[in-house]
């Protein structure tokens, strides 16, 4: 008898991706974040769809429509805060997922890694445009400051900024197009995720040892489906606790003031998940230099496969490289803290030192340490 699961053209794809997929038997909880990101994306699309039913992308009514969602729509407050805090969860998992890739050498899957970086850019763009939509003070000024950075591009910069704005300042045209892009991008991200998975399933998953695990594979279902469900349970407990008890913990109070082009907030800053990049941007006292450093801080991830100089793939058995990895993590925490501080002494110099350390660790220290470890092992 034909097994539908294995013979049906559509179900067969699902079967090979989530049921009969051969998976290393030793992957740890660090491998849960991929599925958690998938759940987050689904949650964001769903809550976003319901928000879009009540939201109006017009400068005169955008702020009021968000207030209306929270006050008058059935469970509108829940949908809105799930969407806002879901974005924070999304970025936490993204950073964990990337960190796992760096630690265990998953970046040696070049295709999967590079499409992952493109996904990161797409998610960052989506989150930025979503932050503009409530049309609060920080929405307006955040949009003004960040889009204005493009004016640093030589020759075409100023024209490009006005083209993106749809006028001579951030206004109705900007809000309308940001809403359109914010709505369409998650679906493009979903398509990119499928390509990401396609490339991953070409090679199979990495594992903590970094060694070939073909001799020891187990089916994805039921072992890892159960494990993923546990991860989702922990995620939902955390997210619901955040939404129910402190929904505004990660937001900015300035965004509860309607956008006013005549009144600049004392400290313009993006959402917490962009603060590390914002700190790098601000640490260079030159517009173009800052923009280049900002883009480089993310694009540098593309260099990891090229700069991999160790004879071992994973950092599991490389204690010196592990120290550098955690130095990098600590440094990113410092950058995140600095990004939220005013531009004054001592924060300026701390930010500059942390920015230099970030690039120096990735470009010089990590490859050098890997070579030194090779020498220690007489390889």
From Swiss-Prot:
Belongs to the cytochrome b family. The keyword Ribonucleoprotein does not apply. Pfam families: Cytochrom_B_C (PF00032), Cytochrome_B (PF00033). One of its GO terms (cellular component) is mitochondrial inner membrane. Its main location: mitochondrion. Its cofactor is heme b. Component of the ubiquinol-cytochrome c reductase complex (complex III or cytochrome b-c1 complex) that is part of the mitochondrial respiratory chain. The b-c1 complex mediates electron transfer from ubiquinol to cytochrome c. Contributes to the generation of a proton gradient across the mitochondrial membrane that is then used for ATP synthesis. GO terms for molecular function: metal ion binding; ubiquinol-cytochrome-c reductase activity. Keywords: Electron transport, Heme, Iron, Membrane, Metal-binding, Mitochondrion, Mitochondrion inner membrane, Respiratory chain, Transmembrane, Transmembrane helix, Transport, Ubiquinone. This is Cytochrome b. A ubiquinone binds at residue 201. Signal peptide: none annotated. It is found in: Mitochondrion inner membrane. The chain crosses the membrane at residues 33-53, 77-98, 113-133, 178-198, 226-246, 288-308, 320-340, 347-367. Heme b b566 binds at residues 97, 196.
């Amino acid at each position: 008898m034909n097994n539908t699961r294995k013979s049906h053209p559509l179900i067969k794809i699902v079967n090979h991706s989530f049921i009969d997929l051969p998976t290393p038997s030793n992957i740890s909880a660090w491998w849960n974040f991929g599925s958690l990101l998938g759940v987050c994306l689904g949650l964001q699309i769903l809550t976003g769809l319901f928000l879009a039913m009540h939201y109006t992308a017009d400068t005169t009514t955008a702020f009021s429509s968000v207030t209306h969602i929270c006050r008058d729509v059935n469970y509108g407050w829940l949908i809105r805060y799930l969407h806002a805090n879901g974005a924070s969860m999304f970025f936490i998992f993204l950073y964990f997922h990337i960190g796992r890739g760096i630690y265990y050498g998953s970046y040696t899957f070049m295709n999967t890694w590079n499409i992952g970086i493109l996904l990161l850019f797409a998610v960052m763009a989506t989150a930025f445009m979503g932050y503009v939509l409530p049309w609060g003070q920080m929405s307006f000024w955040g949009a003004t400051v960040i889009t204005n950075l493009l004016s640093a591009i030589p020759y075409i910069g100023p024209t490009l900024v006005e083209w993106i704005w749809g006028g001579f300042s951030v206004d109705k045209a900007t809000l309308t197009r940001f809403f359109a892009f914010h709505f369409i991008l998650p679906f493009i991200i979903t398509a990119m995720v499928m390509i990401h998975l396609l490339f991953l399933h070409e090679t199979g998953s990495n594992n903590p040892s970094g060694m070939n695990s073909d001799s020891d594979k187990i089916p994805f279902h039921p072992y890892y489906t159960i494990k993923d469900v546990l991860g989702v349970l922990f995620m939902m407990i955390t997210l619901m606790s955040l939404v129910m008890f402190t929904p505004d913990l990660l937001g900015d109070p300035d965004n509860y003031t309607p956008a006013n082009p005549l009144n600049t907030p004392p400290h313009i800053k993006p959402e917490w998940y962009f603060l590390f990049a914002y700190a790098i941007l601000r640490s260079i006292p030159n517009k173009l230099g800052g923009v280049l450093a900002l883009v480089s801080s993310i694009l540098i991830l593309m260099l990891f496969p090229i700069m991999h100089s160790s004879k071992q793939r994973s950092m599991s058995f490389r204690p010196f490289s592990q120290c550098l990895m955690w130095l990098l993590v600590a440094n990113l925490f410092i950058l995140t803290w600095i990004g939220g501080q005013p531009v004054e002494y001592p924060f300026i110099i701390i930010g500059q030192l942390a920015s230099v350390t970030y690039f120096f660790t990735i470009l010089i220290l990590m490859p050098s340490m890997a070579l030194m470890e090779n020498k220690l092992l007489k390889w």
